[in-house]
Curated annotation (Swiss-Prot):
Pfam families: Porin_1. GO terms for molecular function: porin activity. The lineage of its organism: Bacteria, Pseudomonadati, Pseudomonadota, Gammaproteobacteria, Enterobacterales. One of its GO terms (cellular component) is pore complex. The chain crosses the membrane at residues 34-42, 54-63, 74-84, 92-101, 107-115, 142-154, 164-171, 205-211, 216-223, 246-252, 257-264, 274-290, 296-303, 327-334, 339-346, 367-374. This is Outer membrane porin C. It comes from Escherichia coli O6:K15:H31 (strain 536 / UPEC). Its main location: membrane.
């Protein structure tokens, strides 16, 4: 019986971090779920900047309220706290925080810190035990989590076509707060939540469409964002007026088998370590997993991000370079719905050369061991 229960529970746990949430309150049309996890995590690597303790925890809630029989309000917040640093250091941050309204079959609208629509497709390969999803990153235009997202989502195409979903999104500017990119004192480029240039963005729009049918899924997403003045200086490669992303993906999720692949082409949007952005980048991720009934889930994946005609900084000229390239082999074992353990081996295929050293890109292998309690 335990084996059968695990075979049903594990796929549900992989869908979303809140899938295993604990219901705190459910009365009179108001519902609040609490979810979280503690990951006792250790990295083994020759790269001393990552080797060692990586323990962290995440905590969040999802709430909704029934306003009318046609209208539902909702909100979500998720926070991460590092457990590998002394108490004197502030190592915690908000991952998502947004609120919205859902109008039955018409769709939903929300605003706040959320996931960009490009992640609607690229998330299909972001399922490795520890690594993965690194051909993009947070606060990277509309490719993953970011600030100031206004999102409209429609599920099952107005209730007419099961499995056909689409989204349209706008992101407001998140630029410098110091005024360093405002030489004329016009206020252009300044926002109230400033950050360094590598994590800035101008106004952007994007959209996604996905279709799922009997375990098969296909999806596509696009985004186009203005770039800030601070991003278009001689200090960085990859200057340009706009950052653009085009992605497509396929997946199969049935019969204990999970297969997914995505290809993304970006222009002035893929970060190249600390050097800036690739004028053009070709990103590819593929993953295969199998869920055994007794709780074991082995995983194998390949990820690559290749920058094209990267450009010049100072006296250095960079042409075509691999920004990221590795094979990932790992496995997760689920004791039950609340407890699991995993090992994940990142086999780095990058060469240690002048480019990787200039960009601060790691070229060493990493083995991750984790023990997870989630609720």
């Amino acid at each position: 019986m335990k084996v059968k229960v695990l075979s049903l529970l594990v796929p549900a746990l992989l869908v979303a971090g809140a899938a295993n949430a604990a219901e705190v309150y459910n009365k009179d049309g108001n519902k609040l779920d609490l979810y979280g996890k503690v990951d006792g995590l250790h990295y083994f690597s020759d790269d001393k900047s990552v080797d060692g303790d990586q323990t962290y925890m995440r905590l969040g809630f999802k709430g909704e309220t029934q306003v009318t029989d046609q209208l539902t309000g909702y909100g979500q917040w998720e926070y991460q706290i590092q457990g590998n640093a002394p108490e004197s250091e502030n190592n915690s941050w908000t991952r998502v925080a947004f609120a919205g309204l859902k109008f039955q079959d018409i769709g939903s609208f929300d605003y706040g810190r959320n996931y960009g629509v490009v992640y609607d497709v690229t998330s299909w390969t972001d399922v490795l035990p520890e690594f993965g999803g690194d051909t993009y990153g947070s606060d990277n235009f509309m490719q993953q989590r970011g600030n100031g997202f206004a999102t409209y989502r429609n599920t099952d195409f107005f209730g007419l076509v099961d499995g056909l979903n689409f989204a349209v999104q706008y992101q407001g500017q998140n630029g410098s707060v110091s005024g360093e990119n405002d030489p004329d004192f016009t206020g252009h480029g300044i926002t109230n939540n400033g950050r360094k240039a590598l994590r800035q963005n101008g106004d952007g729009v994007g959209g996604s469409i996905t279709y799922d049918y009997e375990g098969f899924g296909v999806g596509a997403a696009v985004s186009s964002s203005k770039r800030t003045d601070a991003q278009n200086t001689a200090a960085y490669i990859g200057n340009g007026d706009r950052a653009e992303t085009y992605t497509g993906g396929l997946k199969y999720d049935a019969n204990n088998i999970y297969l997914a692949a995505q290809y993304t082409q970006t222009y002035n949007a893929t970060r190249v370590g600390s050097l800036g952005w690739a004028n053009k980048a070709q990103n590819f991720e593929a993953v295969a997993q199998y869920q055994f009934d007794f709780g074991l889930r082995p995983s194998v994946a390949y990820l690559q991000s290749k920058g094209k005609n990267l450009g010049t900084i100072g006296t250095r000229n960079y042409d075509d370079e691999d920004i990221l390239k590795y094979v990932d082999v790992g496995a997760t074992y689920y004791f039950n719905k609340n407890m699991s353990t995993y090992v994940d081996y990142k086999i780095n295929l990058l060469d240690d050369n002048q480019f990787t050293r200039d960009a601060g890109i790691n070229t060493d292998n990493i083995v991750a061991l984790g023990l997870v309690y989630q609720f």
